[in-house]
Amino acid sequence: MRLLVSCVDSGSIKEVLCNIGTDTSVQSALQPFHVAPHLAEGLKAYVDRMWVISEDEAILARNSGVVELVKISKHLKENEALQVDPKGESKNEKSLSDDLPKFDISEFEITSSVSDLFDDAKLESLSSKSVKRTKLVDGFVTLCPIKKDSSNNTFVAATKSGLLHIIKKGEDKKLIKLASLGLKAPVEFLQLYDLEDTDTDKYIFAYGGEENLIKLVEIDSSFQSLKQIWEAKNVKNDRLDMRVPVWPMALRFLEPSPGKTEKGKLNYQFAAITRWSHLTKYSTQHGRKPFAQIDLLPNREPLSQMEVFDAKGENVVSSLGNFQSETFNELNVITTDYKKNVFKFDGNGRMLGKVGRDDITGSSTYIHVHDGKYLLQGGLDRYVRIFDIKTNKMLVKVYVGSRINFIVMLDDVEIEMPLSPSAKAAKGKQKRKVTELEEDADELWNKLEGKVAASKASKKSKI
């Protein structure tokens, strides 16, 4: 497996190469083959978001307000020319290469960047109104391609201050800022819609945040203007007739509602997680209020993230994380609180379990379902973990020495382990045994076929 991990403390991305079964917290367990930092720029410039464009290119967004285009090149890891075995005899290069696993490692080079993408002044006036105890600081909430396109040349970079930047990778491999548009701040998330081939002249996305109701926005292909096409309404007051606070934290679209639809009304469906531990379900055909609001946790513990998954381990999400289904009945969500819990719920709010409940010791700052099979998790305890989405079994645990902000799995290919001399001898012996059995079987069949042919010939001669 090959991972890229955003490390907050050093501002670097670390490349991690490991196999299933790796656990750095157990000395006798399998250890990672390679862990190396790249592009370190310090605590004030850690990587907020990453998007892998291709095998040899990625785009990074740092919390210093910079978006960078990065070239990735791979080369075979060089083994040391000489080692000494326990008996004191030196090993030559050939025997050493036979004893060590072979794999490629990556080198990263920044080829282009755009800067000054933040507006902290816009958040200063909102800090006094926020229930957060810390000052609001700008950061990236989204970095992704604006449409399903194999070329992936145009990207959306959205910030907490409500700035929406359109950035293009030119033919000369340089980043160009095409436009910057404004949204209502503060913004906790911005989610693009990618579940159907919409009109190429417009793109749809949803956003929201603290006291910022969910809004659907349409942007034209020229990227010069945007138009709000729908806004949610708050639910009715609670049983004490108190206003319910608004704070959507994350959102995922579903496919359009099937069957009969009312003309003149938008047809979008989506589910959202709120800060106050609600799962809300919306259909624009139904109205502006959620048609269902489910309490996930009894004491309204704050929740922060949202991923959707299939209980059978199948890939049910689009490239941007939206749920490829028309019905909420099949919806399953993973979310995290600010303690140490990673929860799994079905679409009706029934808890399906906790992931890593006996192992995770700090708040999870990042979760992601990869390819429907793996849950990537990292947080304050400085461990990268990979879980099996069906069984919740921990497959990988690697210490990276820093708080974790983002994880990308580049591939899940296992690195082939070289065999020891005794294992090689046993494997060769087994192979020879199989070959001998196959030869004996062939010889036996040949004898039987010869006898059958001779029997037929004798019968013909008698006739």
Curated annotation (Swiss-Prot):
Subcellular localization(s) per the UniProt record: Nucleus, Nucleolus
GO cellular component labels: nucleolus; nucleus; preribosome, large subunit precursor
Superkingdom assignment: Eukaryota
Keywords in alphabetical order: Nucleus, Ribosome biogenesis, rRNA processing
GO-annotated biological processes: ribosomal large subunit biogenesis; rRNA processing
InterPro entries: WD40_repeat_dom_sf, WDR74/Nsa1
PANTHER family: NOP SEVEN ASSOCIATED PROTEIN 1, WD REPEAT-CONTAINING PROTEIN 74
General function of this protein: Involved in the biogenesis of the 60S ribosomal subunit.
Family: Belongs to the NSA1 family.
Complex formation: Component of the pre-66S ribosomal particle. Interacts with NOP7, RRP1 and RRP5.
Miscellaneous comment text of the record: Present with 2740 molecules/cell in log phase SD medium.
Protein name as annotated: Ribosome biogenesis protein NSA1
Naturally occurring in which organism (per UniProt): Saccharomyces cerevisiae (strain ATCC 204508 / S288c)
